[in-house]
Amino acid sequence: MEDTQYLAPREPYVRDFDAAVRAADGREVVLERTYFYPEGGGQPADRGTLDGIEVVDVQKVDGETVHTLADPPGFDAGDTVSAAVDDDFRTYSMRAHTASHVVYGAGRKLLGTHGYGGFDIAEDRIRLDFETDGDASLNPLTIQRMANEVVWESRPVDWYEMDADEAGAREDIVFNLGNDAAAADTVRIVEIEDWDVSACGGTHVRNTNEIGPVAVLDVSNPGAELVRVEYAVGERAIDEWIETQRNASRAAETLDTGVADLASRAESLRAENRSLEAENETLAERLLAARLTALSENTFTRNGREWVAGTVDGVGPNAVADRVGELTDGAADVVVLAGRDGSTFVVVATDGETDANDVVGEVTDEFGGGGGGQPTLAQGGGLDADPETVVASLRPD
């Protein structure tokens, strides 16, 4: 039987055709010839109709292209049907697939790698993965610039068959084929003039200018030795740019500046914020020091040991832990400080005679939460009580 999968890649601009039905089983239909593209190689299945019935899926099964319809058809094997491939979706898939070769060509030039890590066309974006030898990254603006240059240079796109052994011997050819295609005697080559040569079975445009604009949405490292580029093409790319411009305009209006000055304004605000954070940290340290001094003058005796217990405001447990040991150097044998940082916490420091973990355990047994640490310094958190109640529970009646 003739393998019908490659009619769409060979003649990707065909949208309407008539074909005889080879087999019909429920909602699944096989035609003698078809221009529907079955899902594969990262490209989604075509959409469209057979005799007006919606085609909801197209898959390659045992060498045949199987069309799954939304409803059981009224035709049988041997009948001739009128088929229509959804023009908008096929055109988008063609643009997206050729754009992947453009972006991949740019990535290879920047990364110096031939590694192909995967590809997928979704409705809102396209994903392309590069395999690398180690840590690597790509500048999204550089990739975007290079891709759009190839688009407006209107480079021809050609496809042809090549002997598989000859193709495999060429280092400049990238392979993006399934196991069956890769094992064939010949492979289909897609070539963008002076830019990229790949073995590929997808549908493509004839010239890069048909892709339209390319907008790089994100560059990430989803795994070891892998770089991922996500991008949009055509109308979707324009929509992304408009949304980016809209957000930039809103941000500029909020910051009372122009879009062109957003970066410098953001840097200025970050510097101001860091300065304020430093001032706040210094002030908090001073307040904590003053609070520790005041608490050191109010000791009490418990189990034959001198204790200090009190509350602190405006600081977290780590900041308290950094300073609480100062009071065990002479003011007290055991120091307990409670505060709030989302929930109530307690920090305990001792001179070693009393285990700080035992004190934290006493508090968490009564008020919940958990914690621990070293014999001379421990913390507890998630307490179901306010700091004042925690401190009061430790003082002798």
How would you label these PLM feature ranges?
Residues M1-D397:
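A glycine- and charged-residue-rich anion-binding loop/surface
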